[in-house]
């Protein structure tokens, strides 16, 4: 893996590493990536700071054979683990959690030395308007006590579902009948989470962007032409299960274009790993 923007002809290749292979030691590749992807220092950034991590094919598809994991390579997986290691909490929509078969973050998947005294692993926070989750599935029931899964839902969710989820997870009612980007972020901020990482899906990313709350986009462009019917990372319709501002079943309009500033580009085996910051300066 090498940095191609900003250009640094004298810079070394970043290399590769796999969590868990080197014990407590942090390989040079991870140190370099942690610096490139560091959250802005406290006092110099909006708080909380919302980062998204997404992957797309060269022709813009957000998934391959129905899952984003089909577009991921070794470099993307390494950055994925570093971003998770740096985050306070990982935010995901319920439909994405189901399709991608989310589980709690395992210690072997991240770099504990990057946690800086926080819980060994970041919790997963799931956004679900109607709480259509398996209360006894691994995502809720398998989380460790220090990083219990957080379920962000509404007062309109069936009481029996809320009670079932609360057996294992922290259930947070963050709205009467829908969840807005501001209430989602506010609920996490109230619990001390400042460095937020969302992994989508596209509907959730769209809502945060159109609310003006997305600060940072990490996008891997995979050297693949999908050529099918997969959607883009920034979706038009609002997913009903995620309680989007547009409401269940409503199609969004043309949306709000957000200007982004390119912070860096890494290249590895044809994959481009880009980081964009909101704004132009």
Predicted segments with their positions:
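Enzymes that bind and transform nitrogen-containing heteroaromatic metabolites
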Residues: 1-281
């Amino acid at each position: 893996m090498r940095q191609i923007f900003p250009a640094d002809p004298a810079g070394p290749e970043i290399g590769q590493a796999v969590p868990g292979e080197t014990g407590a030691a942090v390989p040079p590749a991870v140190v370099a990536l942690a610096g490139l992807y560091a959250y802005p220092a406290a006092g110099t950034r909006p708080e909380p700071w919302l980062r998204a991590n997404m992957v797309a094919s060269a022709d813009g598809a957000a998934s391959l054979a129905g899952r984003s994991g089909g577009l991921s390579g070794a470099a993307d997986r390494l950055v994925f683990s570093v971003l998770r290691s740096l985050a306070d909490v990982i935010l995901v929509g319920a439909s994405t959690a189901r399709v991608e078969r989310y589980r709690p973050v395992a210690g072997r998947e991240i770099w504990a030395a990057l946690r800086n005294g926080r819980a060994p692993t970041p919790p997963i926070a799931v956004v679900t308007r109607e709480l259509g989750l398996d209360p006894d599935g691994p995502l809720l029931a398998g989380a460790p006590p220090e990083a219990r899964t957080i379920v962000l839902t509404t007062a309109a969710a069936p009481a029996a579902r809320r009670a079932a989820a609360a057996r294992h997870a922290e259930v947070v009612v963050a709205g009467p009948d829908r969840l807005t980007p501001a209430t989602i972020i506010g609920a996490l901020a109230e619990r001390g989470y400042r460095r937020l990482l969302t992994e989508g899906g596209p509907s959730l990313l769209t809502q945060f962007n159109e609310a003006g709350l997305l600060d940072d986009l990490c996008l891997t462009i995979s050297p693949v032409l999908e050529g099918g019917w997969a959607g883009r990372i920034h979706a038009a319709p609002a997913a009903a299960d995620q309680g989007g501002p547009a409401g269940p079943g409503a199609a969004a309009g043309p949306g709000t274009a957000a200007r982004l500033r390119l912070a860096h580009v890494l290249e590895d085996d044809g994959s481009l790993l880009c980081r964009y910051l909101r704004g132009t300066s």
